[in-house]
Amino acid sequence: VAEKDLYKVFREAFKGTDFILSEHPKQLKHLYESFTLSDETLSQIYCPDAKAMESAQKRGWGVSPDFSITNTRTGKILFGEIKRQDGWVEGKKPNDGRGNAHERMCKLFAPGLINAYRKIGGITSEDILPFWVVLEGDITRDPKRNREIAFWFDKFDKNYFMWRPNMTSQDLLKHFYMYLRPYLE
């Protein structure tokens, strides 16, 4: 499983430091529940009774990132996603990269989520996004999907990492320490 490799890498690297890696952090699990809809919207949608709403919300109406990295000294948190997807590489067809794992990460760019990530995580600098995406699998070498992802992230190219097959855990750690750790200080 892809996620387990990343988790293992950071757990080892963070031993004896101020940093902690958490799997599926819960800070955003109930993010949407208390969001107030307008009276106009409420008049046009299904509104179950309080008991039904409470039951439905127990599982959480929010976001569950794959991981977070917390600096226990500063309290700042970087939320993260891991995306594994097939792709167009040698011996395959262009449509072999048609999965949508990379497209699903576009929700991270929603203004409301960015604001929540900044508020909860304490990363307020506009020089960086408050999340990090690590991509794995053939997508990391796919000429079409690499262009899409680079275009989407634009000047925030440090907020994603293509963990390609020829790379090691040291490459992943180097990227984190060089480009993202400073924002957790």
Residue spans of the language-model regions?
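Active-site metal-binding core of divalent-cation-utilizing nuclease and nuclease-like domains
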Residues: 22-75
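Catalytic cores of nucleic-acid endonucleases
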Residues: 74-78, 83-149
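Short acidic alpha-helical/loop segments enriched in Asp/Glu that coordinate divalent cations
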Residues: 21-23, 92-93
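Non-catalytic C-terminal interaction segments of nucleic acid-processing enzymes
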Residues: 125, 134-185
